[in-house]
Amino acid sequence: KLAGINKKLVTVIRDPIDRILSDYNYSRTSYNKKGGASKAYRTKIYAAGNYSLEGYVSYLKENRPVYGRYISRFVLGPNKVDDPVKFLEQNYFSYGVLERMDLFVDDFHKKSGLSLIQQNANKTIARAVKEIPDSARKSITEFCEEDIHLYQSVRKAIEK
């Protein structure tokens, strides 16, 4: 059934704010596990290990060409797309959002006849930050504006 399909891509998009928080916690944990010399390099992991969540987001903003448009750059490409759902419809076989994997699994099954099994894995247990302070949320929202637009557009489209 998949042989005749021209679209080869599938994607599941995560809430950008949750993704930043998860990335911060994961990077912070990774930094704390590193040895002395490797802690000296000024990287994203260094920023997570030494700064608050808001400081970490400031570091990401300062290095926007590398860390900006984190989701949309991989899903939509190098240029801004005004209608991300239309782009996904034209270029992706199936798409969804992590928080509604049930809808993605159903859509993929309807289109392919293949059943996917949902699994929860890869969770950072030792989270330094569980709740996002309002000031950090504002900073993340500004930094992830395009990713948030993509996520909200996709979520709205799949929940119709």
Model-predicted regions and their roles:
Residues 1-13, 17-118:
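PAPS-dependent sulfotransferase catalytic domain
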Residues 100, 116-160:
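PAPS-dependent sulfotransferase catalytic core
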